[in-house]
C-alpha cells in the first residue's frame, strides 16, 4: 500500500501506471462468484493482503491514468512444478494421481493474454475511455475437476486419476464483462493450456 502511495504521489513524472490486483480484494472469507468490479467498495477483506489490494483498487478510480488489472488465478509456460496445470502433467508422467483438496470454481488466465491486455492498454490508454479497474478472466467458469478435464482433452496430454478430497467450496471467480467489451483478440483458456503442455519440460 505504501509503495502504491509513493508511486501515485509522483504521477506527474510519468504518463501511466499499471497495477496488479487479486481476487482476494473481494474478501476470500466470503463467496466470490462471478463478482463484478463494482462490488469492490462493498467488500471488506479480513487479512492484510486482501485489504491492501481492496484499498488500492478503490484509490485507482481517483486517477485518470492509473489502471488496475485483477487476476484470480494465472498460468503460463515455464511455471513452477507445484502450479495446478504443470502438476497435472508431472503427476501423469509419474503415474501418480492428482489430488484436489477442495473442488472450488476458480478462474485462471494465461500470461500470454495478460501481456495482450497490457499491450492493448499501453497502445490505447490515451485514446479510449478504458476501464480503470478490470477483472482478467475468461467467460467460461469451471471447477478444478472440470479444468483438469479441459487440460486432458488437449491432444498429446496423458490423463491421470483425479482424487477430490472435498467436493465443493467457496467460488473464486470474477465477472468478465468489461474485458469482453474491449474485444481484444485473446488466445483463451484452451490455447493457453496447450502452450503450458508444449513447454512442460
Spans of model-derived segments:
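NAD(P)H-binding glycine-rich loop region in Rossmannoid oxidoreductase-like domains
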Residues: 1-2
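Conserved Rossmann-fold NAD(P)-dependent oxidoreductase catalytic core, especially the SDR/UDP-sugar
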Residues: 5-46
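A structural motif corresponding to the C-terminal end of an alpha-helix
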Residues: 7-16, 56-66
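Hydrophobic/aromatic beta-strand patches that form the interior of the parallel beta-sheet core
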Residues: 18-19, 67-69, 134, 187
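Active-site helix of classical SDR
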Residues: 48-52
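C-terminal substrate-binding subdomain of Rossmann-fold SDR/epimerase-dehydratase oxidoreductases
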Residues: 100-201
Amino acid at each position: 500500500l505504501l509503495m502504491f502511495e509513493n508511486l501515485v504521489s509522483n504521477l506527474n513524472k510519468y504518463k501511466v501506471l499499471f497495477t496488479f490486483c487479486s481476487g482476494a480484494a473481494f474478501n476470500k472469507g466470503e463467496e466470490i462468484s462471478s463478482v463484478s468490479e463494482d462490488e469492490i467498495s462493498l467488500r471488506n477483506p479480513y487479512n492484510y493482503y486482501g485489504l491492501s489490494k481492496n484499498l488500492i483498487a478503490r484509490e485507482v478510480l481517483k486517477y485518470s491514468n492509473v489502471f488496475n488489472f485483477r487476476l484470480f488465478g494465472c498460468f503460463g509456460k515455464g511455471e513452477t512444478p507445484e502450479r495446478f496445470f504443470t502438476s497435472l502433467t508431472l503427476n501423469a508422467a509419474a503415474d501418480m494421481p492428482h489430488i484436489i483438496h477442495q473442488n472450488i470454481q476458480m478462474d485462471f488466465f494465461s500470461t500470454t493474454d495478460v501481456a495482450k491486455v497490457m499491450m492493448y492498454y499501453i497502445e490505447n490508454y490515451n485514446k479510449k475511455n478504458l476501464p480503470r479497474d478490470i477483472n482478467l478472466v475468461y467467460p467460461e467458469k469451471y471447477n478444478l475437476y472440470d479444468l483438469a478435464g479441459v487440460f486432458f482433452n488437449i491432444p498429446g496430454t496423458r490423463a491421470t486419476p483425479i482424487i477430490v478430497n472435498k467436493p465443493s467450496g467457496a467460488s473464486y471467480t470474477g465477472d468478465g464483462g468489461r474485458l469482453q467489451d474491449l474485444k481484444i483478440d485473446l488466445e483463451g483458456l484452451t490455447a493457453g493450456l496447450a502452450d503450458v503442455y508444449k513447454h512442460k519440460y
